[in-house]
Curated annotation (Swiss-Prot):
Cofactor detail note: Binds 1 Mg(2+) ion per subunit. Binds 1 thiamine pyrophosphate per subunit.
Positions of transmembrane segments: none
Organism: Nitrobacter hamburgensis (strain DSM 10229 / NCIMB 13809 / X14)
Described function: Catalyzes the acyloin condensation reaction between C atoms 2 and 3 of pyruvate and glyceraldehyde 3-phosphate to yield 1-deoxy-D-xylulose-5-phosphate (DXP).
Name of this protein: 1-deoxy-D-xylulose-5-phosphate synthase
Catalytic reaction equation(s): D-glyceraldehyde 3-phosphate + pyruvate + H(+) = 1-deoxy-D-xylulose 5-phosphate + CO2
Gene coding for it: dxs
CDD domains in the cross-refs: TPP_DXS, TPP_PYR_DXS_TK_like
Sequence positions that bind thiamine diphosphate: 105, 146-148, 178-179, 206, 316, 398
UniProt xrefs under Gene3D superfamilies: 3.40.50.920, 3.40.50.970
Quaternary structure and partners: Homodimer.
């Protein structure tokens, strides 16, 4: 069947499968993947013989490597679950059986097998496939993901919904050992164990942080313990124990627990949480995976945890040798593994932060760096090389990171909590309750502020201006360029009576001249970058560069424009805001954040001081739209929502009651 279909012309294959008419055959080399070519959905996979699955997995890995070499994206984790993905879709009846991938980094092979192979080379591009699972993209994605450790909670909800509805389908969560460092995963497991819900959790252990060595004995025991005979005998023993004196029954139960614990000691914690533990087994050995998954599928009672050991980057030499470098990649040469990284024109913001913190720490031994499993992404790895004893990676545990920092602050230390904006959301109660209410001087370095591009809505740093700006006694800054970031880090070091935050985007700076050392800024004071008379552009953050380009175009239209860098959202430079409103016909605020942020604070200030009463100044706030934006390049995303130079010019003309198109034609 596979050979026949693979050797037929592409047009013949499309005619046999009308639903494949839109496949982009031109960008996919099907000739190297004859069995995979026959699979449009998992239903096609399940028609194959068991002995064909090894070839399917090999071809699936080959296709994943080739696709990601074209698009870039998360890489190592997906290669590590190729066999597991193949086996799950072969054994379970997806999408009727719900399959939830935690985070979604490993979901590319899953997408290829579930009707999206034709678009796999559009991953993370505008209008293309998401880099994560997404409900609106496919019925095979029953739950969206991107942030860590949500899969077990979501799966338990689906399992309970199934039970309440009288359904019989399976619910499977696949979660990595790294995600198991988050408290939410254990909260969900504790709840699932107490409810005794029929739920399957597959622990994908790809860092060997949990598992002992695996092999034939482990595979045998996993088949034994997951088999119906053993489980029936175990259940019968439990029923018998109910009729025995309590002391004897308790001793018998302990003997059974000890015997299983002796043979499979890594399952003790999960058994205590109420899960029936199976494993560990080799996640790359289909002969081990398939029978155990079948046994697990057919279990009728209670939550089950299947422990599978895999290797990140499996099957691709460069990724196996350097898992950290191939966790996420840009486009690369498949034959060499060399990634197509262009030479930067300016330093990346996270590196500027890390280097600035090192310079400050050389003068102050109280400075501490904290990250939540993102040392290289935040620049904390730079600090760690210089001060390993003052660096703490707490794992995927943002709530703990914030309160841990608060504890350090109570003892006179100066903790810098470096966390992406989108992940800091997970520690919000701790920011309010443990930091802000107590006025503890925890310093937040908020990376990936604003739109981040290819990772889309789940990773956008859109809301921190709003969710931090409403907190009393909080200093909030935004760097307009990399030099400003250096000074803002120094400013945070000097703030010892309240919490502070500095936000900055992903990617490179502007290439401005860098200061040798950071100098603390006057708290709550902005700066005038360019003086004009007709229009005022008040920017918070890196949209300042777009304001400068917009001002040049406005000047060509005869509109003299002032550009101001707010620097501080809180405390706001009230004098500067009132002066800009008083001296100009139009005042525009620009920020890389949502409604409720900087622009709202400016409007509130103007209203409180009566600056809007006379109607002499026309004020507009330019913010991100009130919607979640799909992935694209950051520049394309900002342009699409009008937060670029053209959008700023258009907003000025709109405030003046003029048509920008007409005015541009006049100028030409």
């Amino acid at each position: 069947m596979g050979v026949c279909c693979a050797t037929a012309p592409a047009s013949d294959r499309r005619s046999r499968h009308p639903d494949m008419q839109n496949w982009n055959v031109a960008v996919t080399d099907f000739s190297k993947t004859p069995l995979l070519d026959t699979i449009r959905t998992p239903a096609d996979l399940r028609k194959l013989r068991v002995e064909q699955l090894r070839q399917v997995a090999d071809e699936l890995r080959k296709e994943t490597i080739d696709a990601v070499s074209v698009t870039g994206g998360h890489f190592g984790a997906g290669l590590g679950v190729v066999e597991l993905t193949t086996a799950i879709h072969y054994i379970f009846d997806t999408p009727r059986d719900r399959l939830i991938w935690d985070v979604g980094h490993q979901a590319y092979p899953h997408k290829i097998l579930t009707g999206r192979r034709d678009r796999i080379r559009t991953l993370r591009t505008g209008g293309g496939l998401s880099g994560f699972t997404k409900r609106t993209e496919s019925d095979y994605d029953p739950f969206g993901a991107a942030h860590s450790s949500t899969s077990i909670s979501a799966s338990l909800g689906m399992a309970v919904a199934r039970d309440l509805s009288g359904g019989k389908n399976n619910v499977i969560a696949v979660i990595g050992d790294g995600a198991m460092s988050a408290g939410m995963a254990y909260e969900a497991m504790n709840n699932a164990g107490a409810m005794n819900s029929r739920l399957i959790v597959i622990l994908n252990d790809n860092d060997m942080s949990i598992a002992p060595p695996v092999g034939a004995m482990s595979a045998y025991l996993s088949r034994l313990y997951s088999g119906k005979t053993y489980r029936s005998l175990r259940e019968a023993a439990k029923q018998l124990g109910k009729h025995l004196p309590k002391m004897i029954a308790d001793r018998a139960e302990r003997v059974e627990e000890y015997s299983r614990g002796f043979m499979v000691n890594s399952g003790t914690l999960f058994e205590e949480l109420g899960f029936y533990y199976v494993g560990p087994i080799d996640g790359h050995n289909l002969d081990h995976l398939l029978p155990v998954l079948k046994n697990v599928r057919d279990m009728e009672n209670g939550p089950i945890l299947l422990h599978v050991v895999t290797q990140k980057g499996k099957g691709y030499g460069p990724a196996e040798a350097a898992a950290d470098k191939y966790h996420a990649v840009v486009k690369f040469d498949v034959s060499t593994g060399a990634q197509s990284k262009s030479k930067p024109n300016a330093p990346a913001y996270q590196n500027v932060f890390g280097q600035s913190l090192v310079k400050e720490a050389e003068k102050d031994d109280k400075i501490i760096a904290i990250t939540a499993a993102m040392p290289s992404g935040t620049g904390v790895d730079i600090f760690n090389k210089a001060f390993p004893k003052r660096t703490f990676d707490v794992g995927i545990a943002e709530q703990h990171a914030v309160t841990f920092a608060a504890g350090l602050a109570t003892e006179g230390f100066k903790p810098f909590c470096a966390i992406y904006s989108t992940f800091l959301q997970r520690g919000y109660d701790q920011i309010v309750h443990d930091v802000a209410i107590q006025s503890l001087p925890v310093r937040f370095a908020i990376d990936r502020a604003g739109l981040v591009g290819a990772d889309g809505a789940t990773h956008a740093g859109s809301f921190d201006n709003a969710y931090l700006g409403c907190l009393p006694n909080f200093v909030i800054m935004a760097a307009s360029d990399e030099a400003e970031l250096v000074h803002m880090v120094a400013t945070q070091v000097a703030i010892n009576d309240r919490p502070s935050a500095v936000r900055y985007p992903r990617g490179e700076g502007r290439g401005v001249e860098m200061p040798e050392v950071g100098v603390p800024l006057p708290i709550g004071k902005g700066r005038i970058v360019r003086q004009g008379s007709k229009v005022a552009l008040l920017s918070l953050g890196t949209r300042l560069a777009e304001c400068e380009k917009a001002a040049d175009e406005l000047a060509a239209h005869g509109l003299s424009t002032t550009i101001a860098d707010a620097r501080f959202m809180k405390p706001l430079d009230v004098d500067l805001v009132l002066k800009l409103a008083r001296d100009h016909d139009v005042l525009i605020t620009i920020e890389e954040g949502s409604i409720g942020g900087f622009g709202s604070h400016v409007m509130q200030t103007l209203a409180e001081h009566g600056a809007l009463d006379s109607g002499q100044v026309r004020v507009r706030a330019m913010v991100l739209p009130d919607e979640f934006l799909d992935h694209d390049t950051p520049n394309a995303m900002y342009a699409s929502v009008g937060l670029d130079d053209r959008g700023i010019v258009a907003k000025v003309f709109e405030a003046l009651g003029k048509d920008v198109t007409t005015e541009t034609v006049k100028l030409a």
